[in-house]
Amino acid sequence: MGYLVGVTALWAFSFSLIGVYLAGQVDSYFAVLVRVTLAMLVFLPFLRPSLLRGKQRLALMALGAIQLGIMYTFFYHSFLLLSVPEVLLFTIFTPVYIALLDDLMFKRFTPIYLVTAILAVLGAGVIRYDGIDSGFWLGFLVVQGANLCFAIGQVGYRRLAADLPPTLAWHNVFGWFFIGAMLVALPAFLLFGNSAALPSTTLQWGVLAWLGLVASGVGYFAWNQGATKVDAGTLAIMNNALVPAGLVVNLVIWNRDADVGKLLLGAAIMGAS
């Protein structure tokens, strides 16, 4: 639990740092590439390939590709379509995806999640009822893509950890996770990146360094370790604890002119889901 609480406090600043200093200024594919590269470099010196079998290494790489590589691609693009508070609020549905994946894994169906989806859309509409356009709904869907990838990564990591020895030194194998993410981030930048929109200030490079080395490197290792030490219910709660933490940071420091009333009303409807 302590891992999850600590990472929640750490990640509460990430949304605003991306939205304020990087979105629309630094190419999103490049930002993802730098972030993943720095995180990978944190763990490469500790990597011991002999600790995992081939299929286990591939599984950890696949989880990194989904939970980090693909998720970040969705996540960074969402800031081009939505405000920071909106991105934060729309991440509230990750626990729903975790539950749905759990249902799928155990061949169950829980109808209440259909009601949850309807309430989610209503809550989103309240937040932007006076300015809804195709870009807004696209942004909403992009965030859901990120949420789904993050959920798949967490569920998959828990399953993988359950099949590995409890004494495994995870810091000696976690580099595979970031290598998998790199296999998505590098081709994405080479194919779609804009080399004319690289960081132009020391502040932007500093933000990328912090996000890569600390928020991604330390953060994802600690979060995934924490996910293996709690039950699914606690993990779901902690997924949503990031929402109020990130909102407080954004509204207090960077976004004091936001329409707090609409945000609270929309959040209440989504919270009811």
Where in the sequence are the language-model features?
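Specific alpha-helical transmembrane segments that line the substrate/conduction pathway
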Residues: 30-40, 76-108, 114, 146, ...
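Hydrophobic/aromatic residues within transmembrane alpha-helices
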Residues: 21, 31, 78, 104-109, ...
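Membrane-interface helix-cap regions at the ends of transmembrane helices
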Residues: 13, 17-20, 38-54, 121-135, ...
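Transmembrane alpha-helical segments that form core, pore/gating elements
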Residues: 19, 40-43, 98-99, 132-193
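Helix-helix packing/entry segments at the starts of transmembrane helices
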Residues: 33, 87-93, 157-182, 213-252
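Specific transmembrane alpha-helical segments of multi-pass solute transporters/efflux pumps
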Residues: 10, 14-15, 44-86, 91, ...
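Loop-to-transmembrane-helix transition segments
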Residues: 1-7, 48-75, 138-146, 198-218, ...
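Hydrophobic transmembrane alpha-helices of multi-pass small-molecule transport proteins
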Residues: 43, 93, 109-129, 240-241, ...
